[in-house]
Amino acid sequence: MRYLTSGESHGPQLTVIVEGVPANLEIKVEDINKEMFKRQGGYGRGRRMQIEKDTVEIVSGVRNGYTLGSPITMVVTNDDFTHWRKIMGAAPISDEERENMKRTITKPRPGHADLVGGMKYNHRDLRNVLERSSARETAARVAVGALCKVLLEQLDIEIYSRVVEIGGIKDKDFYDSETFKANLDRNDVRVIDDGIAQAMRDKIDEAKNDGDSIGGVVQVVVENMPVGVGSYVHYDRKLDGRIAQGVVSINAFKGVSFGEGFKAAEKPGSEIQDEILYNTELGYYRGSNHLGGLEGGMSNGMPIIVNGVMKPIPTLYKPLNSVDINTKEDFKATIERSDSCAVPAASIVCEHVVAFEIAKALLEEFQSNHIEQLQQQIADRRQLNVEF
């Protein structure tokens, strides 16, 4: 399975084409739109979320509610394009018109793609960079992930997410599965402890009042994964490596870990390796899950636990020093409308990116021309965990 997105932040629409989805999978557009709505929420979001009400239109690959096995095309309209039609349209405009609209950007923002992207593609107007490098593109990726979540649900695989940390304010590292699932989306910062939620809101407000931004840590959990998905044979087929690449490809994500992650460096091996147990009902399982459900680049049947680190958003209302690329003079960087904290929304994006990587790995592991074939093969693999 693979996908390709297109579109700019203030262009007319985002488009995504997904190839490799099995035939006969029931798809309801409202299920995808429900996930799109989640991405737009969260404390600390900017004013654009009041303008955009993201919904998906499926224009190919689905007929009468079921996938055909052919490429699926989805479109997300940018409602804000009405205010940008001339400056972001495909039709040529004069230099005078461009200057009068005052949308040309020559002062790159530190921490953004502006300057390096301008160098790479020889853009003297850095808007040509920031329009595509914007996190607006993640709306299309969430649409893909939502499609994948429908697929995973049909395979009895659950995936969900939460916020672990914002600006140094931390929730617990781990919760049991039932507590986790029972408290999803209980508040607007997506943490389970309400007291910690208020402390996070206060931290976000403090950053906003200072014209600053803050980052954090999110966690994604995948449950009921069949064993042996991925590979120990080749580096590029290791499941944890593929998930890691997907996570750090999300805008502003700078780190990823699994299970106890970097804390494993602080402990002896006897406290980190997960002992192997067996009973006739479950088959093989682990007495703990310090490694986050992954051994040797493969799923081991335990919940896969993914932690992603998001840096503070680089667009600041008290901008840092930069240099005008035309005059080479020092200036404060350009200010674009932005969030003060997007960590709650980023947890949704991360969840859907992981959903795609999991679905892709499953479709490579098992024959998957149609959903019934895939369901049977995964059932056989689950039985192998008992019979081996």
UniProtKB/Swiss-Prot annotation:
Question: Which pathway does it take part in?
Answer: Metabolic intermediate biosynthesis; chorismate biosynthesis; chorismate from D-erythrose 4-phosphate and phosphoenolpyruvate: step 7/7
Q: What domain of life does the UniProt record list for this protein's source? A: Bacteria
Binding locations of NADP(+): R39, R45
Q: How is the cofactor bound?
A: Reduced FMN (FMNH(2)).
Which E.C. number(s) belong to this protein?
4.2.3.5
Question: What GO cellular component entries does it have?
Answer: cytosol
Checking Pfam families in the record gives:
Chorismate_synt
Q: Which GO terms describe its molecular function?
A: chorismate synthase activity; FMN binding
Question: Which top EC class applies here?
Answer: lyase
Tell me the GO BP annotations in alphabetical order.
amino acid biosynthetic process; aromatic amino acid family biosynthetic process; chorismate biosynthetic process
Q: Where does FMN bind?
A: R132, S133, S134, N251, A252, G296, K311, P312, I313, P314, T315, R337
Name the catalysed reactions.
5-O-(1-carboxyvinyl)-3-phosphoshikimate = chorismate + phosphate
The record's annotation in InterPro entries points to: Chorismate_synth (IPR000453), Chorismate_synth_AroC_sf (IPR035904), Chorismate_synthase_CS (IPR020541)
The protein's required cofactors: FMNH2
What interactions and quaternary structure are annotated?
Homotetramer.
What's this chain's function? This reaction introduces a second double bond into the aromatic ring system.
Q: What is this protein called?
A: Chorismate synthase
- Please spell out the taxonomic lineage of the organism that makes this protein: Bacteria, Bacillati, Bacillota, Bacilli, Bacillales
